[in-house]
Each structure stands twice: as C-alpha cells, then as structure tokens.
C-alpha cells in the first residue's frame, strides 16, 4: 500500500516538473523566436536609438506665398559611456572648438546621462557635416542627427511669426513630449500654434559595429516609427501689404495693424522698429538676441499687442456712441466750443460753433466731446457718477476696450479702462465726477489701448456693431480646416442707427472741406477715418489714425500709430491711406506722399 502511494506521488512530481519544464521551453521559444523585444535589450550595446525629429509645418500668407519653411541642419550627438580612444584634437579641429570646450561639452553630456544621447554640438552646417561624416567612424560614441531650422524667405513679420528656441528644464518637466535639446515656439504664432506645428517624433533603431559604423537598421526597421511632419498654417496675412507696411515704417517707432472686418483675419501686423526674423535662427540666435534685447529702440517689443497707448481723438467716436445710446445727445445736439464752451478743455481747431456730432468728428473738436462726456456723467436716470461711469465703461468694453480680444497671438495686453473702484481709491468714494476724469472724453488720462484694440474698434464700426476676434491663422493643416474664430461673433451694445451717425462723421474726415484727413482721400473710394494726436508722458505727441474702406462693403480696417511724431494727420493718416490703396488696388499712384513717408526718419524725434 505504501509503495503504491509512493509510486503515485512520484508520478505526480515527475509530471509537475515535466509540465513546468514544458512551460519554460514554450516561454523560451516565444522570447527567442517570436518576441524580439528581448533581443533588443540583449543587443543594446550595439544598437543606437535615433530620434527622428519631424519638420515643423510651413506657414503661408493668404495668397499662398511661403512665409516660413525649414532648412536642414545637423546635431552632433554623443553617448558618453561609449566614447573610447577618441582623437580629441581632431574632433576639436573639425568643429572649430578648443580642448576646454570639448571637455565642457562632455561634462554637460555626462551630467545629463552617461547612457543616453545628448547634443554635443548643435546646428552643424551642411559643409561641416560633410567633413565629419567622412571621419565619424573614428569617433566612437558620436553620431549625427538631422534637424531642421526655420527660414524666412521674405524677412518680414518677425513679431507676427515669432521664433523657436530650446525647451527649458521647466517645460521638459511639464511635458511627456519634450526632451532636453528639443525646440519649441517661443513667441508669435510659432508659440500659439506649437502643437499644430511641431508634428510627431519618430524613432529609428540602428545597428553599429565596433568601429562606430552604421551597419543598417535593426530587424529591417520592424521597430522603427516614422516622424510625422507638423501641420501647415494658412494665415490671413497679405505678404505684399506686410512688406509695404514695414517699408513705410522704417526708421519710425510704432505699429500698423490691418484687419478684414468681414472675418477678423489680420491682413498686416507689424511693430516698428522690427528685425529680420532670420537673425533669431541657428547658432547666431543667442548673440543676436542679446544685441536686439539691449537696443534702446526696443526692436523685440511687440508694440501691436503690448504697446499700450493713449488713443487720443480716435477714442472720441466711442464716447459719442455711448452718449447717443444712453440718449443724452442726439444727432442734432449742438455744443459750443467758444467762450465758456472752451473750458476746461480748449479747442485746437478753427471752425464754426456751435457744432453737431458730424462736424465734431470731422474737425476733432475737443470741447464737444468733453460736453458729451459730461452729459453722460450727469444722466438723471442714474443715482450717482459711479453708476453712470460703470454704464459708460460697460458699453466701451462691448466695443473691445479694456479687455483682451482673445487673438491667437501670445502676450496680448488688455490696455486700461479702469473700473470705478480705481477712482474711488484715488479720490475717495463719492468725491469724483466728470470734471475729475474729463481727460477720458478725448482719449487721454487713464485710458490706454493697444493698436490691435484700435483696429478692432474700427472694424466694429465698419461692421455696424459687431466684430470677430482678430486672428492671424485662418486654417490649419489644409485650407479647408478653418479655425473657429468665425463662430465667435462679438456684438457691441450700440444700436446701428447711432453707429451710422458716427460713420458719416468719419466720412467727413476725408470728404469734408475741413476734414483732418482730406488731403489723403483716395479718388473713387469711399473712406471713413479719424485722426488722433495723443500726448504722452514724455510731453511729445503720438500720431494716431484709424480708418476703413470702402464704407459700404468694408474690406480693410486699419490702425497706424507713429510714436512721438506729432499730429495724426501728419504721419499716421497718410501711411494708413497708402496702405489702404496698396491693399485694394495692389499699387500706389501717389508717389510723392509715398516717398515722403518712406524716407522720413523719426527715430530721433
């Protein structure tokens, strides 16, 4: 009986071992024959994992002109642990670096990781790459990795397009996508559309022999993944108009922004002084950035969305529209600008008095607009100045003042349209009134606007009461894949009938016998505009102008600001008029005006 039990146990034990052994054999077969990932691990010492960086998407203007493309460069990569018996003198000679530079780079690579590849020398030219490639087999642990850099064929739109640079450690820590040495959009639409532009990385596994020679792909590329190029961007920018605007603004400080009112697409976006965007590309970027950053005329400052200026007289129509909407004035209301009517804000133009809103806009009469503001701040339908001011401010914010417009450009500022609490804090609750803040009525004092806000305001008027967020990119990936800005209609709280009154006044700026921009009317084109002369903290005046055309079916709205250049009619108005002519007619006939604007140097004003 005992022997039988023993025999049964022996059978069970043997069977168990046989089953376990069979399982191990099956697993071993799977590992060695079917699942090659273990082979990858076993052969890690002779395999090289090379990231395939995708080309960033291209950027086009509204007519298909190429604004940004890619150019091939090469990074010399190093895996410190694999570096053996390297002729440092030879590699230093090929790269044009010192022995000290070699050791600094190697230390940085070891600190990053002895086992992983990192950039030893970045952005090697094609010529240098050719020399190195021939001798690369002599430098164990080194290999070349292709990259691309941005190129700007027309050398325009630096603030609009932006630039790319290396990711920071903070950005690496926050992302699963970026690794040390990767590039990322830093400003402009390169930053705003980074995810769309960057593409998807790929990976190639290459076999390398003991002489550091690439002997082919592992498993015929079975485990490789291809990089996917980033999506192209199709912008609303008119490259010819942009180039022309930059020519007009040469040797001047300021900004031009133009919009298609029907869509909100930005046609021209420039900040002056600007710079050639190619300066911030490649190995010279760091040096050039330092030069630009230290330049006293601030070429890196994006004045179009970060410059906050007093709007001056361009703001007067906004005040008029609020007065009309609140019912404190009508189109027939007249105010005098002589005698007591010229106090506390004097008139700076010679014209008939009293005058109505049409004449006041045409001739930019300060006292008229101050008295409109005083009427608003005395409206008997509200209990106090604070309530009246809050209503006034709410109307203005519906026009796009005092808030961000949610454009597709980074670092947009909102200007300044202070809430009533600010004046409570400055003057005391209940201790301020229209007289206290009278400068607001003519676009001075605390009110500040960006050029983007002013052109958006002109666009809102052109559309008779609404606007779409100003934006640069109209579609991503292909021209049919539109951005969603066209679904974001913003409606101002002003009735169309009151906007039409203001538009008629703006037409008279060009067409009236005393219009402040009558000298810059384009024949056979209906135009509406407003000059602005805004005093700055330096005591000098900025030259401001907003306009749109044609009045009946607006195709362009524009804002021009020329810093410390004097009257709006002297510089900003003619520049805006030339830009409108260029866009609508594709040529400019008024050569004398054009030459005067192009040749003027106002940087030393």
Model-based region annotation:
Residues 68, 209-214, 219-221, 262-314, ...:
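Beta-lactam-recognizing serine transpeptidase/beta-lactamase-like catalytic domain environment
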Residues 1-286, 308, 331, 388-398, ...:
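Periplasmic/cell-envelope proteins involved in peptidoglycan metabolism and beta-lactam response
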